[in-house]
Amino acid sequence: MGVGAKTSLVAYAGLLSQYERANVIGTKDFGEILRRHVLDSLSCLLFTPLKNARKVGDIGSGGGLPGIPLAVALPDAEVTLFESTGRKAEFLRYAVKELGLANVRVVNARIEESARDDDHRGKYGVCTARALARLSVVSEYSLPLLRRGGHVVAMKGRVDADEWTEGGRALKTLGGRVSEEIQVHYLPDVEQGERRLVLLEKTEETPEVYPRRTGTPARNPLGAK
């Protein structure tokens, strides 16, 4: 990563720490934002499919994590930030403009709606989701957006046995599978909780009935007993 990209990442951390119109990340501490959020987002690049992606969708982008750091690191990729909350989407547009990121667009809509939109359904090579929801919910949000053979990078903390089982059932229904998992180990001076990256692969076309109606995936997770 070149000096320009590193400068942009530092500038982005500054935008997050100084923005006053909405609480987009939960902390205003610049150092914490840079270490625990911006740099953590770059751990997605441990997966080769993301490094080679040409069209990336960041689901539930919030303050732009991991989407904006990835857009900085992957200037040849088209990155779409999906965010349903208006004030957060407003910040995303502001940050994209301030950082001069010509390869990023912001979509302010519920992800269930976007995933049924022909402009987005089946169009992405990689989707990302950082600490968003259970694997089953992330799968229902993201697999419809992917082309066949595409991948999801789910940035998770601890995943218990029930979540793995539920996620496996959901993936079978949606036409996907877990293809890889990485435990991220940080340097001792970086205060970071457990970070697990789960790579999902879309192996079959997702049935047209998914995702279900807005709010249903979160209220009634696919694969839950």
Annotated model-derived regions:
Residues 165-225:
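SAM/dcSAM-binding transferase cores
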Residues 1-57, 87-104, 213:
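Class I SAM-dependent transferase core
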Residues 146-148:
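Helix-to-beta-strand junctions that scaffold the AdoMet/dcAdoMet cofactor pocket
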Residues 16, 70, 156, 200:
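Residue-level signal for inorganic ion chemistry
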Residues 88-90, 160, 164:
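Short alpha-helix immediately C-terminal to the canonical SAM-binding loop
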Residues 84, 132, 155-159, 183:
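Short strand-turn motif at the edge of the Rossmann-like AdoMet-binding core
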Residues 42-140:
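Conserved SAM/SAH cofactor-binding pocket of Class I
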Residues 112, 157-161, 186:
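Short "lid" loop at the C-terminus of a central beta-strand within the Rossmann-like core
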